[in-house]
Regions:
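Compact soluble domain cores
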Residues: 1-71
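Short, compact, well-ordered microdomains
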Residues: 60-104
């Protein structure tokens, strides 16, 4: 299992600050990371789904996932969505980053 709260995945400073000290937010982020690694990319459009599929098939490019932040976890977060992006599929080790759209 991927453990975001112990820095096994890069997180933006904003995501880290939002999740730090809140086990329930960290647990939700780990759930999102597990979905991302299982090819459940959340709420992305068909174009991004096709691009993700091509990236996996060709071992080239990046994978993006988008997960809406549940209202009970938002806690003042202005972004309603978390993005997870895995880059450099053609050059292992890959880099996975968790960020809010406003961090991009």
């Amino acid at each position: 299992m991927i453990d975001l709260c112990n820095a096994r995945v890069n997180a933006s400073a904003t995501v880290h600050g939002w999740a730090a000290g809140h086990d329930y937010r960290c647990a939700w982020l780990v759930e999102c990371l597990n979905r991302h690694t299982a090819d459940d990319w959340g709420d992305i459009d068909p174009h991004d789904q096709a691009a993700n599929t091509r990236a996996i098939t060709n071992s080239d490019g990046r994978i993006i996932s988008a997960y809406p932040v549940p209202a009970h976890l938002a806690g003042g977060n202005p972004d309603p969505t978390v993005w997870i992006i895995t880059d450099d599929l053609d050059q292992p080790p890959t880099t996975t980053t968790v960020l809010f759209p406003s961090d991009y």
